[in-house]
Amino acid sequence: MSKLVLILNCGSSSLKFAILDPATGEEKLSGLAEAFFLPEARIKWKLNGEKGNADLGAGAAHTEALNFIASNILNDELKNSIAAIGHRIVHGGEKYTQSVIVTDEVVKGIEDAAQFAPLHNPAHLIGIREAFKAFPHLKDKNVVVFDTAFHQTMPEEAFLYALPYSLYKEHGVRRYGAHGTSHYFVSREVAEYVGKPADQVNAIICHLGNGGSVSVVRNGQCIDTSMGLTPLEGLVMGTRCGDIDPAIVFYLYKTLGMSMDQIEETLVKKSGLLGLTEVTSDCRYAEDNYDDESKPETKRALNVYSYRLAKYIGAYMAVLGDDHLDAIAFTGGIGENSAHVRELALNHLKLFGIKIDHERNLATRFGKDGVITTDDSAFKAIVLPTNEELVIAQDTAKLCF
């Protein structure tokens, strides 16, 4: 068996894992351990096409999950074929512009950037430490892949906020972006789709899932993106508000008497589609009930969501200027599967000569890729499934094999 990469994506209460062959992209194992620290902590997986699941035990967390993977899921052949471990890291700050092998200095850098990703980076560090314990023979073969790295090519006019400059120089307050691994992968897929070298492609990429972001790519490099200092800025998301007037925070604090913790919870966990529907953060609910007059919240939510998305796409078309836009790409759970969201958003952009093909759009869902605009559309819109795990596996292999 060829050299394989174990991929870990640690959240505060969950752990996604996979084993890939970086040379072929073949997935040997995928799974999710979830409900950490709760009585119902559990793990589910698919190994060589066969599904399995198990209880991890009340209160189980990252340690128990990784030990279970190593001891109960992996057979000897698969375990012996794992030659390196790749970790997804949400925030690398300004320091990291590419993937690196884990060292004490790198761990310190991830800790320093945790102030901008307090829910994610500490969990990633737990994953790294537990991987060292579960696979001690691979301690020098752990690689971190940063979601912020792809966006580090943004020019100053894109990443600076109009705040006192000292906040940037002394405290690192600037736009960093997120979902960079996905944006990188899809930008390369666009290049292949339109028959251009990756370093010549110009694209607008819409990664739409429970979290969502848009980036604009010129000559293969990111020049702007919608998420900011944290993943709260930008698009309407599942539970996150995206762009708002910053003075709303003052109003909630001073006039409504909300604490800063309550305000943070409102903006991060109670807003977005959940806030607009007052029912759910699931886009499918809004899509399925869009025309139901007894549920006006669904149309309200989806219209706000798609309008915000269209504004970003239109703005980024302007940012490209004279550089020809090769394609608008949709990816992520909503981007790949919600024909309705794509159509609502693109219909706002008819001024640019974009014409969506209704039948193509409906046919391009559930893992299918393809062009969803008409042949005479001024610009192509394409659906392209993302594969962040493959990027992590390939980056890890480059550094370790």
Swiss-Prot record:
PROSITE patterns linked: ACETATE_KINASE_1, ACETATE_KINASE_2
Required co-factors: Mg(2+); Mn(2+)
Active site as annotated: D147 (proton donor/acceptor)
Reaction equation(s) it catalyzes: acetate + ATP = acetyl phosphate + ADP
Pathway recorded for this protein: Metabolic intermediate biosynthesis; acetyl-CoA biosynthesis; acetyl-CoA from acetate: step 1/2
Record EC number: 2.7.2.1
Subcellular localization, as worded in the UniProt entry: Cytoplasm
GO cellular component, one term: cytosol
Record site: Transition state stabilizer: H179, R240
Keywords: ATP-binding, Cytoplasm, Kinase, Magnesium, Metal-binding, Nucleotide-binding, Transferase
Residue numbers binding ATP: K16, H207, L208, G209, N210, G211, D282, C283, R284, G333, I334, G335, E336, N337
HAMAP family recorded: Acetate_kinase (MF_00020)
Quaternary structure and partners: Homodimer.
PANTHER family linked: ACETATE KINASE
Family recorded in the similarity comment: Belongs to the acetokinase family.
Name of the protein in its database record: Acetate kinase
The gene coding this protein: ackA
